[in-house]
């Protein structure tokens, strides 16, 4: 498990919500039927004072085992994109991580992660987002988050959605998933590193440093 976990939220309603989410077992049968046959393990990472919100896809197997979000190579890349060290990234009073599914969904026949079960976001997101009233910037990572929170603006797929990033500033930025499987995508789209990343880093620094 990561060494950067901060103390849990002390606000009673938030503490209760976090406990309820951590105890969620809605997908027990679904996960038992996967190749890994694993039990649910929701990775819960938010506090109400967070200013940066990351809505991502779902934990991978390594994150499932560590019980810490982005505790993998994807996290290394994401932290580089954001210009954040691990201590800042894992400070729940500054950064909230609310994936489309809080548990590792298992693998598909090709060895890739299964999609996040829609029941997870339907069940938990509204209540969680209601507590995050200090958020100044939301990052929508990957197609599932973008379709849910951008609606028709995300119909063209991840590339077109991310290419239109200027349309969503200053409160939101769509990003591709930082998986190393997307290295080819990054090579095909050099504008991402040249144009979007400098703005992303500046905006993240602004929202985390402004009192």
What is each residue range found by the language model?
Residues 3-208:
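A polyanion-binding, active-site-adjacent surface
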